[in-house]
Amino acid sequence: VLRRAELLKAGGIDFIMNCEIGRDISFAELREKHEAILIATGVYKAREIKIPGVGLDGVVPALDFLTASNRKSLGDDVAEFDSGALNAENKDVVVIGGGDTAMDCVRTAVRQNAKSVTCLYRRDKANMPGSQREVQNAEEEGVNFQWLSAPHALLGDGSVRSVRERRIHPVS
């Protein structure tokens, strides 16, 4: 963590520690001092998916996958990445979801040279919460989107081998 913080500081990032917005400084003061403000609280807990097979090997929470990839790109030793557990290389990857985290996952899997990358999303393209630009970029990179689809079960003997999906039929 300290090494990463030093890399970020060297890149021009200022860290203000033990400072609470609204108590120690107002949001208006921040806006006066800076051209842009990024508030990134982060996701602290993965959403659980409740379908059969979720406990099979090869089913990976998005944040674990992305964190391992980021750590590896920063030069860290990441045993789970090196073993293949958190590395998409030469794998058929299925990402469930349609938000920005899902888009980060599909595009990271492409960069890791996955054999194929498919994204299942329960709504249609026009109603997904993720960035449309990211979707377009992912499509151009070869990601296959299965709109109006949701996972029904993950199948395999010990390790996930396939995903049974169900089609969603919107009501007009």
Model-derived regions, located:
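Basic, gly/Ser/Thr/Pro-rich low-complexity segments located predominantly at protein N termini
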Residues: 47, 58, 102-104
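Conserved acidic residues
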Residues: 35, 57, 91
